[in-house]
């Protein structure tokens, strides 16, 4: 088996990802930089060829010879309108060779031209090497994914790229199909299911509707926007900060490629941060002409900057539903794919569109496709492990799950590394005569005694008819579903009386007491946050007032309307305040307010004289928004009677 491992590769437009199925589960493999996704970039320099992170990191220094987006060229003719329109936006050169596009670069001092298949094969080679480094032996067999709308020539070209990379391509499968396999949606055994896959990646947006019946996948409809993705959101942030830099420093950095590239990298990082935090800060030293650029952005502002792009994702969803002749109520499963679906606003729009339906997002969205491809690869290699046989191969239970029996002994019902979903039932009985009820305490862990394991929850089954010890039969069932949500049910066989508990979120489980304690701490922190928020708000108000006053008196249109002395007075005071701000970023709220009053005393008389008492321009403080309330990251334990 070891030498015959097959891998699954998600060959993406902007990023690629590789996974392998072994030891009964899928491993998504990290590259040498520790990243689980690798940029689909290839760069050519005077001395070497770079692939992946190394290529993307030097793109600012070497844009003409850094190739990306090969997936937009593969299997297309040079005259294809898509190729013609994309060419306008690429920094590298695309040439025509017998109506086939080729990418022209300078490599080791010579001009070279490569077919898109060759560029893609370099990325595939990189993915193959990443897998080999992890597995410790050569790998040849692979399943590679393509968008559902790829035509035959694009599929064949992708397969050729695999062959060039030295891979035996077992199969080319559709990305949405791979994502559905990752979530085990083909194994629910519930008859025909309609699945909508919402795939918002780095460069493209695809909506697919699949019908799955008895393991057979049928693509019913595809829609989307081949030029909408994470990079567009980055661009909005870049433009926003270019404008901010103009406002603050009166300089336009948009023509300086290196500055824009550094800004873009910081924006991409900030965007990722905003999926989990409500505010992100950017710190770029010496961005342009020696000026350091330190700033921040809130999630709300980011959502506003991209609101039209986010909303536009729903149109293809409607189109796909129309084409599939389905109503939104007829969709059984919604699956999120692509890193950009981590954005909370995108999730909310989709969820609201489907009237609050749950989204499948327990697998990392940028890894779901490679995950499914790895599963498919294992099946095609005839992997006989029981996990693949009834492959609801979602995951495994990381720790044994069981309950406490007499004397504090841990009795495991579900052993660690069992494939989930799974269901186990065992009969227990009472410990003493006429015992009226039993306390079911659910634990996870490998130790023999429950006191050394982790308590997940407990519930009581009462109303057991009086009987000698050992007579009552209490049936306990542990049932974990594909998302790792555990349901424990206890039933008294004689009366049919039952009680259950649901434990969700197997990561960092917390007991009720801990949650309670955290709620109280959060209240305390909230008060501290409030003080901090007001402080930042006062600082921002002062800063923007100072900059506004400065621009007001420097306005060309005011030449001659304001005396040089007055102008100097305002500018000096503004400069003094701005310098003070830079030196005292951590001052208290009242200090900022005091400075503001000082500045107003200087500026107001001059500005009001200037506008004949019409009042100066407002100060428009940008109040920084702090994090919103509880984030619901703890587990929820619901008791059901």
Curated annotation (Swiss-Prot):
Coiled coil: none annotated. The modification Omega-N-methylarginine is found at residue 469. The modification Phosphoserine is found at residues 631, 633. Residues 617-641 are annotated as: Disordered. The modification N-acetylalanine is found at residue 2. Molecular chaperone implicated in a wide variety of cellular processes, including protection of the proteome from stress, folding and transport of newly synthesized polypeptides, activation of proteolysis of misfolded proteins and the formation and dissociation of protein complexes. Plays a pivotal role in the protein quality control system, ensuring the correct folding of proteins, the re-folding of misfolded proteins and controlling the targeting of proteins for subsequent degradation. This is achieved through cycles of ATP binding, ATP hydrolysis and ADP release, mediated by co-chaperones. This is Heat shock 70 kDa protein 1B. Keywords: Acetylation, ATP-binding, Chaperone, Cytoplasm, Cytoskeleton, Methylation, Nucleotide-binding, Phosphoprotein, Stress response. Its main location: cytoplasm. The keyword Transcription does not apply.
